[in-house]
Amino acid sequence: INFLMNYNYSFDEAKDWLAGPSYYAWQFMDNLEIFGGPVSDRWVKGRLEMARENQRWKRSLGIDTVLQGYAGMIPTDFANHQPDVEILKQGGWCGLNRPDMIRTDGALYDEYAATFYKAQEWAFGETSNYYAADPFHEGGIRPSDLSDTTIASEVLDSLLEYDEDAVWMVQAWWSNPTNDLLNGMGEYRQDHVMILDLTGLEAPKWDKTSYGSTELDAPEFNGTDWVWCMLENYGGNPSMDGQLAKMANDIPNAYKQA
């Protein structure tokens, strides 16, 4: 909300862009907007206070929060408020409108990224060095004149400009991260990027050089730091069970082979 209010949105206009609370993960992975909203003013205030309290509690336990990173996401009505910005339409996702995206190689991207991070700092303080951003999560429209290499370079550069110790958290999901995205992170990749291998148990990617439509230069995401993850109850599979024998084998094997 604070971010959008820097660009001629009223409080209510910015607030009403938010999806309902159950859908925030998908909104901030650039999949949808508005759906399930609007939320009340009271809810926004309560959510902010609760988040700040959670941050303090987690810090006391030595737990790092993964904050939101910025890869150019904007509302689909952004041109009504900022007509001079070059906007990339991102199409739809599951019958819903995806948020638009500004060009990361455009003249205004660095300014927008800095504004976003300052707005987030106002909300939560300087609480973490970990940031999540996933350009083209489950779709989106890649313009022919803007490569994943350029996007990765610009997103990481703007993040490190704000926080020199930042670590960009990227989900390994479907065909992401692409080879070009990883290569675009350049020399910073070793110290400032971490890949979450979300389906580490069911369908690991860390030991592959090919997944979906992606062909990598080397396994372990071209030698990038990564985290073995277990994502089981999604996609209509809500049962409380797990593959215990597979877990007992796969986790030690990952330690040995990585």
How would you label these PLM feature ranges?
Residues 1-258:
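Catalytic-core regions of glycoside hydrolase
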